[in-house]
Curated annotation (Swiss-Prot):
Residue ranges occupied by any bZIP domain in the UniProt entry: 228-291
A GO BP entry: regulation of transcription by RNA polymerase II
Pfam families associated with the record: bZIP_2
Ranges for region Basic motif: 232-266
Signal peptide positions (record): none
Naturally occurring in which organism (per UniProt): Caenorhabditis elegans
Name of the protein in its database record: Transcription factor zip-4
Superkingdom as given in the UniProt entry: Eukaryota
Phenotypic consequence of gene deletion: RNAi-mediated knockdown decreases survival upon infection with P.aeruginosa.
Positions of region (Disordered): 1-20, 147-205, 238-257, 273-318
């Protein structure tokens, strides 16, 4: 056990208490003292833990009034180039020290153009970008078609080559709900951004379809035969026949459409005539009923002249 008694020094003599008097240890560091040689790295960690525990238990008022030499504390931590084999993980301070040793330096994540657009917006510019004013000089030279051809070829080549953009490592841990982890062997990196959420319906096996019709036989012609003029003549005649058949089919379709429109107009006209005929029949039936009633009334009462009957008939018609 260490002699850890507090003793205030003689302030008038200017002799403050020394740390080695409190701990019975040498002044030149407990962990790497060449003279003593009794402490190793593991012992220095244990010593630091014991000193920290005693600092927690001591009276804070006495602790503030006494003078301590912090070189021993600093020496214990500066000599720890490699973490100890057996670390006391129950101690909170040692856990913090171990985390600091193992933690890598912070590196700013590299964003691709899409993530930069989402994070900073379309108007964001990196510092030092667009500083050269020469880039804004306008070029009024009109290029001919021959000069434009190599540029179009370059752009077409650049569009065909597709570069796989890797997702930054800082976004690998984040996954949305229902999203499955993807491997590079199954599909490309770009396809993983736009893959829809997996569903249980896709897991079901697709039934096999058996075609009921037979496909016509088609054999590809060799390149030598395609170069011959006879083959070109056959292809020209065939194309001409195909165009004629297509034009004829279009004409027949137009003729059918015209006949269909005429039939629709004729049907509407006949329906209107039929409706007018029905209305005329209804009027005739009502008139006949009215005449019968008048005849019955005249037979019971005084007779009316035939002239009055005809006048009433004409009025009802008009």
């Amino acid at each position: 056990m260490y002699n850890y008694n507090y003793s205030r020094g003689n302030k008038s003599m200017g002799n403050p208490p020394r740390f080695h008097e409190l701990t019975d240890m040498p002044d030149n560091g407990a962990s790497t003292s060449a003279a003593a040689g009794m402490f190793t790295r593991q012992d220095s960690l244990a010593l630091a833990a014991s000193l920290q525990q005693r600092d927690r238990e001591r009276n804070p008022v006495d602790f503030m009034e006494t003078q301590l030499d912090l070189d021993n504390y600093l020496q214990c931590f500066t000599d720890l180039d490699v973490p100890a084999d057996n670390v006391d993980l129950n101690d909170a301070e040692l856990q913090k020290a171990n985390i600091l040793y193992d933690d890598d330096s912070y590196e700013q994540p590299q964003l691709n153009p899409y993530e930069r657009h989402v994070a900073y917006g379309p108007g964001f510019r990196n510092p030092g970008e667009y500083e050269e004013q020469d880039g804004y000089k306008m070029n009024f030279e009109v290029k001919t078609e021959e000069e434009k051809k190599p540029e179009t070829m370059k752009t077409s080549k650049t569009m065909t080559t597709r570069r796989a953009i890797k997702r930054p490592s800082c976004y690998d841990d984040y996954q949305e709900e229902g999203e499955t982890s993807l491997s590079d062997n199954d599909e490309s990196v770009d396809d993983s951004y736009y893959k829809p959420k997996s569903s249980k319906k896709t897991a079901a096996a697709v039934p096999n379809f058996v075609p009921k019709t037979k496909a016509r036989k088609y054999n590809l012609k060799p390149d030598k035969e395609k170069v011959e003029p006879i083959y070109k003549l056959k292809r020209a005649r065939n194309n001409d026949a195909v165009r004629k058949s297509r034009n004829k089919a279009k004409e027949l379709q137009l003729q059918k459409d015209e006949e269909y429109d005429e039939m629709k107009k004729r049907i509407t006209q006949l329906e209107a005539e039929l409706q007018s005929e029905r209305e005329g029949r209804e009027r005739d039936q009502q008139l006949i009923k009215q005449l019968i009633r008048e005849k019955e009334s005249t037979s019971k009462g005084p007779r009316k002249s035939s002239r009055n009957a005809l006048e009433s008939f004409n009025k009802s018609n008009y």
